[in-house]
Structures are given as C-alpha cells and as structure tokens.
Amino acid sequence: MSSEKASSKSTPEAPWPVREVNTQVKQWIERLGHLWVEGQLAQINVKPNWKLSYLTLRDVEQEMSVQLTCPTDIIRNRPTPLKDGDRVIVYGKPAFYAGRGTFSLWVTDIRPVGIGELLARIEELRKRLAAEGLFDPARKKRLPFLPNRVGLITGRGSAAERDVLSVAKDRWPEVQFEVINTAVQGASAVPEIIEALRVLDQDPRVDVIIIARGGGSVEDLLPFSEEALQRAVAAAQTPVVSAIGHEPDTPVLDNVADLRAATPTDAAKRVVPDVAEERMLINQLRSRSAAALRGWVQREQQALAAIRTRPVLADPMTPINRRRDEIAQAVGLIRRDVTHLVRTEQALVASLRAQVSALGPSATLARGYSVVQVIPRDGSAPEVVTTIEQSPPGSQLRIRVADGSITAASMGTQQAN
C-alpha cells in the first residue's frame, strides 16, 4: 500500500485493511522508545527449551497489566529465581506484533525492587497520609459493642479466617459473619480487597469490617501498604479493623484503620465480646446493685428505728397534753386581762358619764333653765335665741326644758336693765 493511501482517512467507501491498521499501530508504538516500568509479576511462563519467556506485569494499585517478552536466559541466569508477586523494574521497548495484533514489552533487563527502597517508599507514604490527617484519632470510628454482622476480608481457607471465625464463635455463638475471600498478596490483592471493602461497606447489615492476614514477609504484606487501599479504608463509612499480624514492620493499613489488632485472633477478641465475661459482669453488677440496695434499706431501717425511739413517738399524746395545758393557761391569762380591761373601761365610762351629766345642758335644764329657739318662717333650721333682735313679736319659738319642749310665740321684747 502506498504512503499516499496510508496517510488517507478511512471511509466506508475506502476502509483500511487489517494489515494497514496493524502497520500504523506498530509504527506509532515503536516510536515510544525504551522505558523503565515498575510493577508486580503475576504470571511467569518459562519453558526449558524456549528461547523466549512470557510474563505478566500488573499495576500495584489498579486492575491493569501488560505482557512482557524476554529472552529466557535473563530469567534462567538470575541468582534469585523470580516468582509471582515480586515487585520488579523492567527495561524494555514497547512492541506490537502486527501479525497477531498483540502488544508486549520486549524486555532486556529485570531488576527486583529492593526491600530498603520499598520500605522507604512506605515511610514516605506514611508521612504524607499522616500530614493529611488520615491517622488522626479524632476521625477513627468507634466499634459497636455487639455487632449484628461482622464483615471479614481474608484469604480463602487461610489460618486467619479459621482463627477469626472460631474465636468469635467461642466468644459469642450467635455472631454472624459475611466473609469475602480475596488474594492477600500479589498483584491482584489490592483491587480485590478494595472491591470486597466496597461491597461490605454498602451492606447495611455489616457493622464492622475485619481485614485479616496471618503475617508474612515484608514483600507479602506490601499490598496492605498501597496508597489505593489506604484511601478506600479512610473513605469507608463502616469501622475497619486491621489484623495483618506482623509486629516488626507494621503496614500502613494499621495506621489508617479505625482499630489495629495484633493478630486475627486479637481482632476477633476486640470486635466480638465474650458472652461468658459479659454474663459474669452482669452478675457482678447485679450483686453490687443488690448489696447497695441492702445497704440503703439497712440505713433507712436504722434511721426509722432512731426516730421511733424519740419521746414524741413513744407517747404521741405527751406533747399534745403539754400544749393543751399551755393553751388553758394562756386562755386563763387572756380572760383575766380582758376582764380587768373591761372593768377599767367601765369605770372610765361611768366617770365620763358623770362628768358629761354635770357639765351638759340636761343638768342645767333640770335646775330650771331652758333653751329658746326661734323657728324661721322659711322652714330653715331653728336657731338658739341669744338676743331680743332674734325674736321680734309674732316670732314662733321653741322652748326646750328638762323633760321636753314648748312651742310659743313672742308677744314682745324688753331690753335688759
């Protein structure tokens, strides 16, 4: 095919043949040049009589992989054999095999990632996540006292799974588990654990999630220090317990999880309460409550007995009789005082009456004197006559004497000598 046709656009009327597509892709890929690529070996396919070997290199955080092709001598002549799960750095050139339409990296060098370098990366990640606050105790969620259902992420048929289930059932036989088995090492561990965590976190029946593995080498535990897993655990709404069981070099998951357990067995003990211990505690609390109640009753009985010994309760009528005598005495005093007061006031009234009688008009009238009043013709009130001008002849008079009054008329007046 001419370059002119190769550079033309494909159309329904002039489509490209497969060979042209593969040729164009091959030319574009081969322009990428050599690359250093890091990943985790997942499949190693080596045959003694093969000149070429085929491997799969997986991303450590995402479900992605790339095929590797390399001379068998590179693998055969290594001092330490390669195995699935090894973290490596490969040097190769992207290659596209036009005949089969497949992509691969043609590798000429494979180097294992050193433990020291991996640990340095883990510590760098640990510092970065700590600076973001993912290790902050304030953000850690409290575990439920008695979970309704426990989510368990662990390897299929592993000792960690057996330990968690057996210990939990021994402690609380009614506890329920939702178990999801995943890879716990190797390239597929991180994506599988993240997916299992997502499923359990969305299950409303699950109250707490345990991620368990029974220890292992530093290389085996690398998935539990991958950043993607830490982000997923930090974002989970359900409390997460890390039970990896590796004391010397703790994975980053131990710092991000809401609770770190030393071993899977320890995780079961921390998550599930012991029914025997709880019953014992209930019995102790019941005994303490009963003892406290008995003590209170005894104190109240003693106080009641002390009250009963008081004189007022020994003879309740004594204070009443005492008060009755006091009241009778007070009544006698009041009567005496009132009688004396009445007599004193009566004597005073008699004295005043005598004075009034002696000084009043009645006594004067009794001695022959009278009071003369003129009665006005206009009907107004009578006036006492003190001068002759007040009673001209013909005036109507009222003369008051000791035993009544006399109506008279003025016949005339006479001036005093």
From Swiss-Prot:
**Pfam family membership, one:** Exonuc_VII_L
Do the record's keywords include Glycoprotein? no
Which EC class is the enzyme in?
Answer: hydrolase
Q: Where is this chain's protein located in or outside the cell?
A: Cytoplasm
Q: What is its EC number?
A: 3.1.11.6
First-listed, main subcellular location of the protein, grouped into a coarse class = cytoplasm
- What GO biological process, any one, is recorded here? DNA catabolic process
Chain's role: Bidirectionally degrades single-stranded DNA into large acid-insoluble oligonucleotides, which are then degraded further into small acid-soluble oligonucleotides.
Q: By what name is this protein known?
A: Exodeoxyribonuclease 7 large subunit
Which organism was this protein described from?
A: Corynebacterium glutamicum (strain ATCC 13032 / DSM 20300 / JCM 1318 / BCRC 11384 / CCUG 27702 / LMG 3730 / NBRC 12168 / NCIMB 10025 / NRRL B-2784 / 534)
